[in-house]
Amino acid sequence: MATVDPIRYPIGTFQAPQQFEAGEVQEWIAAIRGLPSDLRTAVSGLNDEQLNTPYREGGWTVAQVVHHLADASMNAFLRTKWGVTEDGPTVKPFAESEWAKTADACLLPIEPSLLLLDGLHARWAALLESMTEADFHRTVRPEGAAGEMPLYVLTALYAWHGKHHTAQVASLRKRKGW
């Protein structure tokens, strides 16, 4: 079994749930709702030099991680909406590494992305809280993937995703003594 890089994956890799568990779903929703606050705490007090430091060698800068979380959350919110309102929609992936190179991800301060996350995650959590168990069993079909993804798995994935990237920033701060 391959060793997981603890700098790249400080909370481990994503483990997809095999079945729907209402209690777990509530934890995932809480994580999604809490991401903006958790991320703000992780980046609080960092100066421009620190924000422009890669969280690992060859990795994104802290600022790029923040902007990536905004990009990924927008995509995940839309995937959730499509999954709830359409029958098994195909959802397009986004080229994360290319998006991280765009001017808004490289040059813009992080505050616009933090503000976007505040509103978006409030809406996303409200949507998730309104969903029934049947809704969470609805699926999306990631373009190029072998099968369908139930919305409860998508929810788990993005709950993990936010914690994963927030932990990357927190880990960098700890390693650097910031």
UniProtKB/Swiss-Prot annotation:
<dbReference type="InterPro" id="IPR024775">
    <property type="entry name" value="DinB-like"/>
</dbReference>
<dbReference type="GO" id="GO:0005737">
    <property type="term" value="C:cytoplasm"/>
</dbReference>
<keyword id="KW-0963">Cytoplasm</keyword>
<dbReference type="InterPro" id="IPR023774">
    <property type="entry name" value="Put_metal_dep_hydrolase_YfiT"/>
</dbReference>
<feature type="binding site">
    <location>
        <position position="165"/>
    </location>
    <ligand>
        <name>Zn(2+)</name>
    </ligand>
</feature>
<comment type="subunit">
    <text>Homodimer.</text>
</comment>
<keyword id="KW-0479">Metal-binding</keyword>
<protein>
    <recommendedName>
        <fullName>Putative metal-dependent hydrolase GK0616</fullName>
        <ecNumber>3.-.-.-</ecNumber>
    </recommendedName>
</protein>
<keyword id="KW-0862">Zinc</keyword>
<dbReference type="GO" id="GO:0016787">
    <property type="term" value="F:hydrolase activity"/>
</dbReference>
<comment type="function">
    <text>Possible metal-dependent hydrolase.</text>
</comment>
<dbReference type="Pfam" id="PF12867">
    <property type="entry name" value="DinB_2"/>
</dbReference>
<feature type="binding site">
    <location>
        <position position="68"/>
    </location>
    <ligand>
        <name>Zn(2+)</name>
    </ligand>
</feature>
<feature type="binding site">
    <location>
        <position position="161"/>
    </location>
    <ligand>
        <name>Zn(2+)</name>
    </ligand>
</feature>
<dbReference type="InterPro" id="IPR034660">
    <property type="entry name" value="DinB/YfiT-like"/>
</dbReference>
<keyword id="KW-0378">Hydrolase</keyword>
<dbReference type="GO" id="GO:0008270">
    <property type="term" value="F:zinc ion binding"/>
</dbReference>
<comment type="similarity">
    <text>Belongs to the metal hydrolase YfiT family.</text>
</comment>
